[in-house]
Each structure stands twice: as C-alpha cells, then as structure tokens.
C-alpha cells in the first residue's frame, strides 16, 4: 500500500538502497499486505464478482449476479497458452464454500462445486443473434469457390426476408432524425400539460376554500358529469330579496286581526246571511202596513178620546190585562185603528209652523226638548224611525 503513494515516505537512517532495494524488503513485507499472506502457496486473495445467478447447495438460497466476495485465486492449468484460474469463496449466508473456474474455450465461467447455475442461456440462432464465423469456415470461403457461391446465395435469400424489417427500422429512425424539432415539440406538449394541471389545481383549491374541504379532490369522470346533470339547485335569495319579500307580505296583510275561530265565524256569517235573505223574502211577499213602517199618529190635546182608546181602557169592574201580555201577543193588521191604516201624507210648511207654535222653544236646546216629550208609539209599529203629525193646525 505504501508503494502507491508518491510522497510522505520515511527512510530510516540504516536504510541502504544497495542492500535493501526497497522499503518493502527493508520492512520484510508485501505491497498487498494481508491479501498476499498465502502467496507462498500460489494463492492470492482478490475481490470476485458473481458472473451469473446461482443457487447455493448449503443453504439453498439464491445468490444474484453481481454479488462480490473475497475469493482465493490460484492457477490450475492452461488452455493452450491461456491460464485457467480457480476461485474459492465462502457463502455469506452459510458456511458452504463455492468453487468456480474460468473456461477460455467458451469464454465463460464453470461451477466446480458448492452451487448450481440458474439456466438463463439461449441459443444464438434461436434468438436471431449474429453468429460469429468459425476459423475453418473462413478458410473454406477463401479457398473453395463453389462453397463461397452457395454461401452467397443463402446470404441473398436471408437479405430478401429481412428487407421489410429493415425498411420499418429505417422509417422509425427517420422519424427521430430531426432531434431539435422533436425536442421542441415534446417540450411544448409538456408546457401545455403543465399549464392545464396548474389550472386544475387552482380550481380545486378554490373549491376547497369555498366549501372548507381538506380532502384531496380526484379528477372528474364522465359518470360524474352525468350525475351532476341530473341534479337541480335553487338559487338562494340574498338578504335584500328576503327583506323585500317580508315587506310585500306585511303590506298585503289585512289590517284587521283574524278571529281565532275562523271556521266558526265563517259558519256564523253564513247563518246570518241566510236569515237576512229569508227576512227580505218575507218582506217582499207580505203587504207593508203603517205599523210596519213605524208611523205614529199624534193627536192634539183637546181632541176627544177615540172610541178605540176607550175600548182599550178597562172599566171599573173588568180585570186589567198587563202590558207585557199585551205586548207579547202578536197583533194583526185588523187590530190596528182605522186611522192608522191611512196613507201618510206630508204635512205642509204651514202645518209645520203650527206644530212648532204648539211647543215653545227651550233655551236648553233640542236635547232637553226630546227628553221632555213623551215617546208615544203605536203598538203596531216596529220602530220609531218615521213620525207623522195629523193634528189639525187650523183648529188651534
């Protein structure tokens, strides 16, 4: 190891180049150090790389091609002038030793003991590989003209069979002849694809931010598009639209509160409508009398009592009919006095003046006058909506 270094060598004072020759001889050591410990037996320790796949006979494990070992190398023979070397190494998985040696005749390695080769060899002719011409065949082609002619015919037939394949290979190679244009086209496609991927990532990130999603989104498919086309979404109203809708609702609402029992109130209103309609039909069919109109005939004070009034007044020996019973008894049009059945006539302005002269005006006003005047209603009248005065103003 020290011989490989060109500097930093130490020569002791007793070193004599004529006597020792080199530092290795002075130190009585070999340049390969421990690797040459068996050099006296003709064995050199080297790094050996496995040439092919094998199976170990000791542990039955597979040892791949390219695995390196510390192997003992020694010469065991010659193939003509080429030496044959044998390599002995220990399996790294067990205590078994594997021995291999070179085969110069076949340019290969042969397993001597300790392992089995994994067969992965094929015939070159079957694989359509180029076969090397043997030395004897070369000499025969040079000396024998007939053999050379036959070999030429075989080569031409092989060429005709291989022409389609060769033309296809040439076309494939011509497509890649302009490498600059092809490189530019490939880089342009890569840029377009990268831009599309970036746009898709931006859309996905926007959707994830909008929906607050943390899961990764997968690319959409045709089935997803069909399923999305079947869905229908309604547009959500904004805050202003909702407020406008509420205002419209409030404006169109009724001012009067609805009764709690709307169904019962509707039934009651229906019954009232029916009663009013029946009343109208009854009034239309029956004749209207003076008593029905509520007309009362007012007489003067000096007019003698009418015979009807005298008849109504009970005598001293007769029992008096209570007023409530008389009011409860329904009266027919025949019970009314004859003077009430007359058609009312409007009094003249003169009659109005006479009636006003009968009653002096009080300073209190019309309210006091209405309180002093007794309410005399005819028993046949239904109300006091209309009053007619038939008193003789001229007699007064």
From Swiss-Prot:
Region ranges (Disordered): 1-26, 295-396
Keywords: Coiled coil, Nucleus, Phosphoprotein
Protein name per UniProt: Probable splicing factor YJU2B
Family note: Belongs to the CWC16 family.
Coiled-coil ranges (or none): 182-214
Main function: May be involved in mRNA splicing.
Subcellular location field: Nucleus
Keyword Transcription: no
One Pfam family matching this protein: Saf4_Yju2
GO BP field: mRNA splicing, via spliceosome; response to virus; RNA splicing
Gene Ontology cellular-component terms listed: post-mRNA release spliceosomal complex; U2-type spliceosomal complex
Triggers of expression: By poly(RI), poly(RC) and Newcastle disease virus.
Origin species: Homo sapiens (Human)
Composition-biased stretches (Basic and acidic residues): 315-327
Biased composition (Polar residues): 340-350
Residues modified to Phosphoserine: 40, 306, 362
């Amino acid at each position: 190891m020290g011989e490989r270094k060109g500097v930093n060598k130490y020569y002791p004072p007793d070193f004599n180049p004529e006597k020792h020759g080199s530092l290795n001889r002075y130190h009585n050591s070999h340049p390969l150090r421990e690797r040459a410990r068996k050099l006296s037996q003709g064995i050199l320790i080297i790094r050996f790389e496995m040439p092919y796949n094998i199976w170990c006979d000791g542990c039955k494990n597979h040892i791949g091609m390219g695995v390196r070992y510390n192997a003992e190398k020694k010469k065991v023979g010659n193939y003509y002038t080429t030496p044959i070397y044998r390599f002995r190494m220990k399996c790294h998985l067990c205590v078994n030793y594997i021995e291999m040696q070179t085969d110069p005749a076949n340019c290969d390695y042969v397993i001597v003991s300790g392992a089995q080769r994994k067969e992965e060899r094929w015939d070159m002719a079957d694989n359509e590989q180029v076969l090397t011409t043997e030395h004897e065949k070369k000499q025969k082609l040079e000396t024998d003209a007939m053999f050379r002619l036959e070999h030429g015919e075989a080569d031409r037939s092989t060429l005709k069979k291989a022409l389609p394949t060769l033309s296809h290979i040439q076309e494939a190679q011509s497509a890649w002849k302009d490498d600059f244009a092809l490189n530019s086209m490939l880089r342009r496609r890569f840029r377009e694809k990268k831009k599309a991927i970036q746009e898709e990532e931006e859309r996905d990130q926007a959707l994830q931010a909008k929906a607050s999603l943390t899961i990764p989104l997968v690319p959409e498919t045709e089935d997803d598009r069909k399923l999305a086309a079947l869905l229908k979404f309604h547009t959500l109203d904004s805050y202003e639209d909702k407020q406008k809708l509420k205002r419209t609702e409030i404006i169109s609402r009724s001012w009067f509160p609805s009764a709690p029992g709307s169904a019962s109130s509707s039934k009651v209103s229906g019954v009232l409508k029916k009663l009013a309609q029946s009343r109208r039909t009854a009034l239309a069919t029956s004749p209207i009398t003076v008593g029905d109109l509520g007309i009362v005939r007012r007489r003067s004070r000096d007019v003698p009592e009418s015979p009807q009034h005298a008849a109504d007044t009970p005598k001293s020996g007769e029992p008096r009919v209570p007023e409530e019973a008389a009011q409860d008894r329904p009266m027919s049009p025949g019970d009314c006095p004859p003077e009430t059945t007359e058609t009312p006539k409007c009094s003249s302005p003169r009659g109005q003046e006479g009636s006003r002269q009968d009653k002096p005006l009080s300073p209190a006003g019309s309210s006091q006058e209405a309180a002093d005047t007794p309410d005399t209603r005819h028993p046949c009248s239904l109300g006091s909506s209309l009053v007619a005065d038939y008193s003789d103003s001229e007699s007064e």
